[in-house]
Regions:
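N-terminal secretory signal peptides and thylakoid transit peptides that target proteins
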Residues: 2-19
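Pocket-lining segment of extracytoplasmic ligand-binding domains
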Residues: 93-95, 103, 127, 164-263
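An extracytoplasmic/periplasmic, membrane-proximal ligand-sensing/linker region
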Residues: 178, 184-186, 195-213, 223-226, ...
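C-terminal segment of N-terminal export signals and the immediately downstream linker at the start
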Residues: 5, 25-38
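Bilobed "Venus flytrap"/periplasmic-binding protein-like clamshell domains
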Residues: 34-60, 64-65, 117-185, 297, ...
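Ligand-binding clefts/hinges and TM-proximal coupling segments of bilobed small-molecule sensing domains
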Residues: 145-156, 231-300
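Extracytoplasmic
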Residues: 32, 83, 116-118, 252-254
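Short beta-strand-centered segments that line the small-molecule binding cleft or hinge
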Residues: 107-115
Length: 323
């Protein structure tokens, strides 16, 4: 008989090892008393968010509740959760949905909502590019292979008949911080990314080359949503970056903080309480973190049974879940 633990690991490894995520070799971490939170590579949006979240939550708690752990991103985070080498992890929305769809086999539960990640392509301000298709045959930076951004790119481009590896000169990097530099230096014509406050977009937009942002064509959005039900229609808000002068319709998903289901309710409740209490500080420190709230966690959850009991207790206390 296959144990639940074995089944859980098999499910998460299958998701993490999918071609879209290109799993890299796992890191080795020593066990620590604080909760270990998997983030991403240096310069990545998840790294910035995770470090900001940990500082705010720990300050509110008056102790070190959580420590951010650098990883290769979503794919590695899923594997490390499955192996028990992380307690919590930042997971790109569609990968999170796939893992949660496995229910008990995944061994994961939602601990808190992060923020939505509308997918976009950035090009230098002077570029003639107006559509994704205009970059066919040109070098485009898609990010770290194991990141959720690459998974999102494959889903979005694939649904409109484009293969990121066949139709473009796909550029993958070892560290997220390298991505905008490839465009700034003229080595690539475009940069794929997602969300408000993403460091790669901020770096390109602030450079002398500037940035202009593109989403799918309006008629392409329904095709993408039909192909990938885990994605939703959303808009990148005007002013999120210099060069984004109007709301940009696109598609994306809610990124989530997932945790192992075998974590005690007490530990998770302590973390959730600290994050909830730090909501104002998080919003002031990072624009996208304004969406990291208890109310958004309740809204972003597909089913109450998928919420970790520790977080569920907080949400019930706040009348955001039925008692």
């Amino acid at each position: 008989m296959i144990s639940k633990k074995t089944s859980r690991r098999a499910v998460l490894r299958a998701i993490a090892a999918s071609p879209a995520l290109g799993l890299a070799p796992p890191f080795s971490f020593a066990a620590e008393t604080p909760l270990r939170l998997g983030t991403s590579t240096a310069g990545g949006g998840f790294t910035l968010y995770g470090e900001t979240l940990a500082r705010a939550a720990n300050a509110r708690a008056g102790e070190t509740l959580v420590v951010p752990v650098g990883t290769n991103g979503t794919a590695e985070n899923l594997r490390l959760l499955a192996d028990g080498r992380l307690d919590l992890a930042l997971i790109q929305g569609t990968a999170a949905s796939q893992a949660l769809a496995a229910e008990d086999a995944s061994g994961l539960r939602i601990v808190f909502a992060m923020y939505p990640s509308p997918g976009m392509l950035a090009v230098p301000r002077g570029s003639p590019t107006r559509r994704f298709e205009d970059l066919k045959g040109q070098p485009v930076v898609f990010g770290v292979r194991a990141s959720g951004l690459v998974l999102l790119a494959r889903q979005v481009f694939g649904a409109i008949g484009l293969d990121v590896d066949r139709d473009f000169q796909a550029v993958y990097v070892g560290q997220a911080a390298e991505s905008p530099e490839r465009v700034i230096d003229g080595e690539a014509a475009g940069l794929w990314g997602a969300g408000e406050g993403w460091p790669g977009f901020a770096r390109l937009a602030a450079s002398p080359r500037g940035a202009r942002f593109l989403g799918p064509l309006p008629e392409q959005i329904p095709r993408i949503l039909a192909a990938h039900p885990f994605l939703t229609a959303m808009a990148a808000p005007a002013g999120a970056y210099p060069g984004l002068d109007a709301d940009l319709p696109t598609v994306g998903s809610w990124n989530l903080i997932l945790g192992r289901s075998d974590l005690s309710a007490e530990r998770v409740r302590g973390f959730a309480d600290a994050v909830h209490a730090a909501a104002r500080e998080l919003a002031a420190a990072l624009p996208q973190a304004a969406m990291t709230t208890a109310a958004q966690t309740a809204k972003a959850t597909p089913a109450a049974a998928l919420i970790h009991p520790g977080t569920a207790a907080l949400l019930r206390e706040l009348k955001l879940l039925p008692g």
